[in-house]
Amino acid sequence: MLNTGRCGSTTFIKACQHISNYTSSHESLLNKTGQQRLNYPDNHIEADNRLSWFLGQLDKKYSDDAVYVHLKRERQAVAESFSKRIDFGILKAYEQGILLHAEHRLCAFDIAVDYIDTINANIELFLKDKTHKIDVSVETVTTDFPRFWKMIGAQGDLDEAIKEWSINYNAS
């Protein structure tokens, strides 16, 4: 599952844990590199916002043979959440490692918006020729998640999965 982060990926995996014919994890291969970084088992759902930096490798390994989910949340809400995390994590890495700002040159919100727009554009470009893809939006999750459930032929307790979306996991 591809995403920017701060958009419900932890909740998505909590919901997927009510699927009995798939395994699911959140950022399970963070300590791996190379081919091992994307070595997920069959019938597995993985949420990791860092996958957006491995799209070329992801395409080589899975091509159009996987179901790709683009998890989204309203841009303003994601940017506000990321703004509170400017001094650590992926936003700090983006500001200092990609933009090469040794110190805060822009406000945290503007850096977050740039990061979000960049990551979403990269994901959209990656997905443009994929046939097994679905967008899931936090704002419309009660209709989007059941479509995802049906698309993958999930078995389990959909009602309990939907209930997970009423809980704020990993909030900031």
Regions found by a protein language model. Give the residues of each.
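PAPS-dependent sulfotransferase catalytic core
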Residues: 1-50, 171-172
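Short, well-ordered beta-to-alpha junction loops that form the rim of enzyme active sites
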Residues: 4, 138-141
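Short, acidic/turn-prone active-site loops that include or flank metal/cofactor-
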Residues: 27-32, 74, 161-163
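Short, solvent-exposed coil/turn segments
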Residues: 38-40, 109, 131, 169
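Short catalytic-loop micro-motif centered on adjacent basic/acidic residues
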Residues: 44-46, 134-137
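PAPS-dependent sulfotransferase catalytic domain
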Residues: 55-125, 130-135, 142-157
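C-terminal accessory extensions appended to soluble enzyme cores
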Residues: 153-172
